[in-house]
Structure formats: structure tokens, C-alpha cells
Amino acid sequence: MAADDIVGCYQVDKARRSLTNVESYPKVGEQLHGFTVQEKKHVPELHLTAVRLKHDKTDADYLHVAREDKNNVFGVGFKTNPPDATGVPHILEHTTLCGSEKYPVRDPFFKMLPRSLSNFMNAFTSADHTTYPFATTNQQDFQNLLSVYLDATLHPLLKEEDFRQEGWRLGPEDPRASDALDGKPEDVLFKGVVYNEMKGQISDANYLYYIKYRESIFPALNNSGGDPQYITDLTHKQLVEFSKRNYHPSNAKFLTYGDMPLSTHLKQIGDVLDGFGKGEADTSVKLPIDLSRGPSNVTVPGPIDTFADADKQYKTSTSWYLGDTSEVVETFSAGILSSLLLDGYGSPMYRALIESGLGSSFTPNTGLDTSGRVPVLSVGLTGVSEEDAPKVKEAIQKVYQDSLSAGFSDEKVQGFLHQLELALRHKTANFGIGVMEKTISSWFNGVDPMKELAWNDVINEFKRRYQQGGYLESLMQKYLMNDRCLTFTMVGTPTFHQELDQQEMVRKEKKLSQLVEQHGSMEKAISSLREQELQLLKTQEEAQHADLGCLPSLRVEDISREKERKPVRESKVDDVDVVWREAPTNGLTYFQALNAFEDLPDDLRLLMPLFNDSVMRLGTANKTMEQWEDLIKLKTGGVSSSAFHTSSPTELGKFNEGLQFSGFALDKNIPDMLEILTTLITETDFTSPYAPAMIQELLRLTTNGALDSVAASGHRFALNAAAAGLSRSFWVQEQQSGLAQLQATANLLRDAETSPERLAELIEKLRLIQSFAISKSSSLRVRMVCEPSSAHQNEVVLQKWLAGLPQIRSPTSVDARSMQQVSSKAFYDMPYKVYYSGLAMQTVPFVHKSSAPLSVLSQLLTHNYLHPEIREKGGAYGAAASNGPVKGIFALTSYRDPNPLNTLKVFQNSGIFARDRSWSERELNEAKLGIFQGLDAPVSVDEEGSRYFMSGVTHEMDQRWREQLLDVTARDVNEVAQTFLVDGPRQSVCLLGEKKDWAEDWDVRKLSMNAGEAEAYPEDASTTA
């Protein structure tokens, strides 16, 4: 090695050492770029050094976390206690990102998405604060985004037209339509991105329960997201005043994380903050209601869950306070106490509340909430009958009493501490975002973030208290053995959605009558609204052609043409193919195995999710699930079994399906981990007298949350259902994890509850799956990620494990290569206030030359067509085009969309738009940058080698695709738009939402527990019983 190379290596190593060397930072009291150091601390167990500073001129708080991690993070948060339920913090979060003094373009936030290599960009409205974080590995990118974020939050333009677009407005559905000239009141509706987002949110019964619970226990803290009933009371003037009052450095907290220099950050941030004087900081901490005088009870109406029994429409929970979150050790201890009571099938709360049949699943607020100043422990149940609702609180209190009497086993506590040790060792790609999420909420509520980061200090103090005996029990006695609690109940009401619609109608009529008074007649009032809508459309369309030269951007030329190689090694162990990734893992080994099934019968495929749930629930002949859960926590970081589905990168429509098994542990515990995993898969006791009840309980858990799980990601469900009609591969995927799977599970539950014979048949099929689930065959493959020094020992362990596996192949079906007819125009009638859409078309395999241009096309359509047409003009929360290069699918989706018919028109015009547009070099470069955000994003060490192992995509394939992507031209984009979107093969579309008259020519289906109503995949349903 040359002398200058040695010097270079020494300097790099020295820089790394100094990065987390606490002495390399200014002393407490010293100043740097207008900031004064308040505190600094080295945290060796997290390999970081934290420095807390205060800006001299404004008193802005600043926390820097230095760590040898190239994925650097910035976040700025403001205390935003909501004054009412109009959603002003939420609407401000949206409009803040719509233009600023230095960057006066419309929507610089979304415009920066494709001008950056960030792997995380977002904004969050929390209960009492609003945060704007990003993460990137590129220093220039960091400085670009930091400049945009600082100007957006501290110098926003907050134009009234942006408020109307993002918040709420009243206007005709389509101001350009000829009938809009007639001025009919029924054609006028409420619009706005946030308004429609929150209408979508209250379609999610879990969200609605949680937010109404929060309003009851924290009435001093209004709904920050906004209630549609009150959003329409907010004015632009109120928004601007709220921003001036709250978005000030004196009311802010700044956080930076990673390996970039603190001094550089402070200079850039300080230059902006120096333009402000000292302002008012909102230091008020909102507290929950006073329960010192005894119990409180609140009951509110909610929607009916069509996937639950008609006589089990109650959701009820009870909440207790557990001290003060500034007591960091006690709050940590309360977290352990909560886990001991609630975590796992063997936990006392699960057994007393769900296994007993009192309800079907925990309420969404169940657990310990430490986001405010007062920690709150809530326990509750959904799917409860009116008669049983009062018994839930009694059952919870009995668990407290029994736990206090029996005490907590040391084995369970040690298992929890072992999980913490593994969490410290596990190298994640998004550690910095995790640091921000862990500290920011409590920081705004007066908790010192330095104490939150001092992991070992907290754990060691907990251990000291715990070793004295009876510590956790004393916390129970202190906080839970009393009746100072809130019981919150939501009752399913058949007219709930109709009442919301009626309330909206009344609000609309009131707004219109005010406009009639102002303009003299209804016709003139609606004409005025139409003119406003047309002006907004004009502004939106002008923005699509605006000069974006003021925005900073990275260059595609800065992206390396060479993909970073993370080499894998392949070997045969006992005739089984094994992929090895040897990397620094902090003494952990990660294991993954795939067992592929060829021509699997359809009825067994539909049962795979239930099988996976069962092996983690039923226990074995010699151990209960509680005992297994304790062992898993003591010996591993977790084990799992799940279905998999992967597509071939070289042949369209070719796929593999089967079961995958995974887990990780300390190197020394890998033999135990493999034995645990194998025993659970092969020896779960389906013949136990308790098995039938447990299986019904698992089916109820899934069906009870089905409507809410769809509402949370309806566009994905819509897309999967649409794609099911394109090929057998996508049809299989829909059976595994789509709406077909949800309906099949509901059918299974109905049959299990009404027919003991069908339940017995179901159990026999689960036993059949168990016989071939994990077996040593030519279809079994393994991946191991570990330290190079651990590979040999892991190979010895693996060989012994493989030798003990059974050798049974999965059954096949003669009909398995066929697929049932699936509609190419499906409409799922669901009780949501907004719509979700998915349009799918099959394209080419990953290695085809059109694959990379299709990905560029998807980015171009998202940012230049779908976002402005469907989100900005149409009011949907989101819209996107996406290319699945390995699956060979091109998709268009919308999310929380009030205007699905307009969206479908936009979708249908997408191909012609993309074909006829003369794409500029800037647009192409931005599209490529957007793709590289994902391609080059850091990955956690356990994911390394996974892409090759799962799908067979080699480094060489990825390298070729990368080069093709960098070389895509405008002509390439025009050509793939013509070939696939305009002239392409059959497209398939699916909508989810409330059925209207215009849906008559669609294939309308309904998901339901009721056999007479369920129309989704009826053929599949009959095969599952």
C-alpha cells in the first residue's frame, strides 16, 4: 500500500473515531454558529454521541445525534396544540408545503420528490405537534432539502388558493361541465384534499374509535387531523394566524442525525434562524381528564361492522394513568408491565378477554401510550355483545388482581430484556428516523431527550429496582389497583353513515344560504363558486408548466452507473441450496427458508394464512403457546411462518408460491431457534380439544378487522383485485392476500360457527398442510446472513437441522394451472365515504428492454399528470402510476378519492398524454432520480441477498437494468406509452367504495359475513369449507 493510501486510511479512521468522540464537540456553554451547547453525552451501547444545543437569538431547541451512519436525518417540529376540531394543524401542514418565499413554486414538497435521492420525505401532524422529517445519504441532497424544508416551514406563502385546494372549499363537481352552468345546489359539494382524507379516515372504524376515545380522555387536546363536521368552519385567516403563532423558531425543535458534520448543519440552520427574534414558545402540556374522583364512562355511536355478528357491535376499553413520562425509568418499567399483561396469545389479558370468547380482538387503543406527559394504559375489546360489554372492565380488573397475587415470572422479564439486547444489536437502515420518533413527542411534553437516549442508564436502573423484588407488582398496586379509570364504549349504529351524510347536507345548505345572502340568488351564488373553481383549475394548470429553476436538484450524472455489489456465496448443504451473505451483524444470524409448492390445490392455498396463524397460536402436545412464547423471547429475536409469492425475472407469468420461514438470534442460539421453528411447524397440535375454539378465535381476529385493514390501504386491495384477471400468477396472489382471501376467511368463520362437520373438515386440511409445510425436498432453499466468523458453525448447525426434516412433497391439483374467470371491471360495494381505485395491465419481464422505460414512464405520469389531475384538481389524497418490473405489471391507483369517475377518465387518457408529450431532459432526469431513491436506499443487514434469493434477480440483471434506466430517452417513454398503455393488451380495473347508480354496468360485489350478501369469489368460498 502506498504511503498516501495509508495516510488516507488513517484519516478516515480518525474521522470515524472523532465522529462519536464526545470530546471532539464544543464544551457545555461554548458557542458555535449562534448556538450554545447545553449538554452532550456519549451512548456507547447505541454507538452514538448526542449534543443538545439552544439557538442564542430565538431559544430554538436543537438535538444532534452523531453516529457512523451514512443515512442522515433532519427533522423540525413545532408545538401545535389544536384550538378546535377544524384540523388547522393538519391543513397547515399541507399548505406549508405549497410554496415559500425562496421557492415560490406551487407545491415545492412534491416537486422536490423527484429532484432528490432522499429515501424518506414526509410531514406528520401529531396530537400536539407537527414534524417535517427527511433522510438521505447524499450530502448535497441533504443541504438542498434542508434549504427547502426550512424555507417552507419558516417562510410559507400560505396562499388562499392553496388553502382551498388542500383544506376545504365548496364548488360544483365539474365546473367545466355544461350542466354546471345551470347552478343546481345538488351539484355542489365539499372538496379539498384534507377534507376528503378525513372523510376517508372516519370510514376506518378503528381510527374513528381511537380518535373519539382521545377526544374523551383528552378533551383539552382537540382533534388535530380535523373532523369533517368542523373542517368547513376553518377560514384562511385563521390558518395564517395559527402559522404565525406556532411556526416560529422559538416554538420549534430541530434534530439532525448521522455522520455529516454538526458544524455544517448549524451554520446552514443558524443563517435562517438569525432572521428571527425571540418569539413565544407554547410550553403548555395538555393533560387528560381528572379521574381522581372515581370512574368515568363515555358511550358514543359508531358504524356497523358487516364482518362482525349483528349482535356483537360493541367496542369498549378502560384506561388508567401510570405516572409521568418525565420519570423515564418508571415509564420504561410500565412498558414492560404492559407487555407482560398484553403481549402474545399466552398473555393473561388475551386469555381472559379473547380466548374466553368475551370479544374478538383488542381495541386500537389497547396498550401503553407514552406520547403525552401522562402515560395511559388502555385495555379493551371489539366484537362484544351489549350484554357482555360491562363484563369487559370486570375481566380486566380480575387480571390485574390475579397478576398481583401471583406475581410475574422472572423468565418472562428476562425474555423481555433479551429482546432489548437483540434490538440494540440489530442494524436497521432507518435508525435515525427511529431516534426522531422515539424522542420528539416526549420532548415536546417536557421530557429530556438525552435521558430517552441513555439506554443502558435506564435498563440498569430498572434491573436494580427489579432485583430488589416486587417492583413490577408495586407499580401495579400504585397505578392499576383502583377504580380511577375511564371506560369508553362505541356502539355500532345502523344509521351512522346516513347521519354523517345528513349532517354534511345540512352544513352544505347552511354555507349555500350564506352565499345566497351575499350574492342575491342561488344561481349567482353557484355561479360565483363555479368561477372560483375555474380560477383554481387555471392556477393548477399554469403550475404544471411553471419554471422550477429556483428549486435545487441533484444531477443524474452524479449517480454511479455501477451498482454496489454485496456479494453472496452459494453452497449445497445436505443437497439443499443455501445462499450466504456474510456481513457485520453484531453477532446475530438471520435465517430464511422457502419451501415452494407446485400446482397447489386452490382450497389449500386459501388456508395458508390460517395455517400460519395456527402454528403461532395452538401450541404443541407438550407445551402451551404461552410456554413457547417465553422460549422464543429468551432464545430468539422472533420466528415466523408466512405465505410467499414471487415472479420470475425472465419469463412473464411464471411464478413460485409456498411457505417461508424466518427468524434471527444470537449466533450461539441458532440451534435453539431452528428447533423452535421446526417444532412449531411440524408438531402444532391440531387434534387438541382446544384447537377448534382457537381456530374460530383466529378467524374472528382476521374478519373483525377486515373492513379497517382494507380502508387503510384500499388502493392496494383494488389493484390486487384488478390484476387477478390478468394472469394466473396475479390470481394466486389475490387468493393469498387480497379481497378473495378476506371473503374466504369470513366464509370459513361462518361455516365453522354453524357446522361442526365443516370445522372438522377444515382442521383436517390444516393437518394436511402441516404434513408438507416444511420438508427436505428439491423445492426447499435457505438463506443465511451472518458474520464471516460464524458461517462455518452455522453450516454445521444447518446440516444437522436439514437431516432431521421430513421428506414429503406437497399435493398437486389437476386443475391448479387453470384460473377462474375474473371480471375486468369489478366494483366492491363497501361502507366508505371515499373511493379507492386500481387499474392494472401486464407488461414484460424484468430482463426485457422495455422494463426500465416503463418505470420512467410511471414516475413521469405520477408527477406530471396523475398528481395534478387527481389530487390537486380532483381532491383525492393520493394518485400514482407504478411499474412492478419483476412482476411485469403497470398500475394506476388512487387513494381516498371523492371523484372516481373523473379518475378513471384520467387513467384512460394517461397513455395518450404520455405518448404525445415532448418530455424534457429535466423531466426525464427527475423521473430517474425518483427511481434511484428506492434503488439505492440503504437496506437493513438482514435484507442483504434477499432479492436474489426470493426472485432470482442476479447482480448482473440489476446492473443491466440500472444502465438501461440511466440511458432511457424521451422517445423510449413515448414508445412504451403507445405499446402498453394505448395499444396494450386487456386492462383490468377495480373500484372500492359506496355503490352509486353509475355503477350499474360494473360487476358489483359485496364482502360480508352474510352468505346471502357475499358475492365476491363465490366459487372459491365453496372450496374452503
Swiss-Prot record:
The EC number on file is 3.4.24.-
Q: What does this protein do?
A: Degrades mitochondrial transit peptides after their cleavage in the intermembrane space or in the matrix, and presequence peptides; clearance of these peptides is required to keep the presequence processing machinery running. Preferentially cleaves the N-terminal side of paired basic amino acid residues. Also degrades other unstructured peptides. May function as an ATP-dependent peptidase as opposed to a metalloendopeptidase.
Of the GO CC terms on this record, one is: mitochondrial matrix
Mind listing the UniProt keywords for this protein, alphabetically?
Hydrolase, Metal-binding, Metalloprotease, Mitochondrion, Protease, Zinc
Query: By what name is this protein known?
Result: Presequence protease, mitochondrial
Q: Which gene encodes it?
A: cym1
Q: Which cofactor does it need?
A: Zn(2+)
One annotated GO biological process: proteolysis involved in protein catabolic process
Membership in a protein family? Belongs to the peptidase M16 family. PreP subfamily.
Assembly information from the UniProt record? Monomer and homodimer; homodimerization is induced by binding of the substrate.
The record's active-site residues are E93 (proton acceptor), E166
Q: Give me the comment on cofactor binding.
A: Binds 1 zinc ion per subunit.
Where is this protein found? Mitochondrion intermembrane space; Mitochondrion matrix
Superkingdom in the source lineage: Eukaryota
Binding locations of Zn(2+): H90, H94, E197
Gene3D superfamilies for this protein: Metalloenzyme, LuxS/M16 peptidase-like
* UniProt-listed InterPro entries: Metalloenz_LuxS/M16 (IPR011249), Pept_M16_N (IPR011765), Peptidase_M16_C (IPR007863), Peptidase_M16C_assoc (IPR013578), PreP_C (IPR055130)
Question: Which PANTHER family has this protein been placed in?
Answer: PRESEQUENCE PROTEASE, PRESEQUENCE PROTEASE, MITOCHONDRIAL
This protein's major location comes to mitochondrion
